[in-house]
Amino acid sequence: IAKEVALTFLNDFGRQQGGQINYAAKRAPKKTLERWKKWGIIPRSIDREVVEMMHRTNIGVDHEPDHLLLQGLRTALADGWGGSMISTDITDILFGTPKPIQAEGSFGIFKQDEVNIVVHGHEPLLAEMIYDVVNEPEMIAYSKTKGAKGINLGGMCCTANEILIRHGIPTAGGFTNQELGILTGLVDLLTVDVQCIMPAITQVSKKFHTKVITTNYRAKMQGAEHIEFDEHHAKEIARRIVKM
């Protein structure tokens, strides 16, 4: 069943001939779906709508404002009713459905007597693995050999919300707080993947002891150390990152 679900999702992403995104047909209210059909904006697939929008807006292609707007709407629906819904469901399947919780936030979450690690970006698998690893008795014992009382994990930006809503891990802040977090002088390690990562954090980190680790092959930074995250060796790589 898991394989069938995964292949259906992949087909919704990359379908090139006919059809439409399953989520649009199955989840949208009937009246909403009828309205989409009327205007011809039901997404065919996620990738296809994005590529077509880029083609139409290239120099000398589509010059009709209303026509461009309709494709913009179809692309937006592909993003929301395709990409966002699929990624949300996959994350819930893999890591569990979030529940309302109480948690802390802001820079007060950092602890002077523990190793402060911050996960930052948008890929929940990396954050989940680091969460698992920092709670391993062996890793906690390792931190104590370095003079710390333990490991304190925090989040930044969207990844922060993933581990907050599922595990109660506090968030250090949002997009505009990443450099300020380093300026506290308390962040020992900042591990990042993709999106919303300011390039200046490596320059700021040089003024402190903070290590910045990039993990995605698509997103490297000058001044950061790169440890590529591989889902097939997730725990092993997460341990390596935490031990930095």
Regions found by a protein language model. Give the residues of each.
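Metallocofactor- and cofactor-centric catalytic cores in central/energy metabolism, strongly enriched
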Residues: 1-244
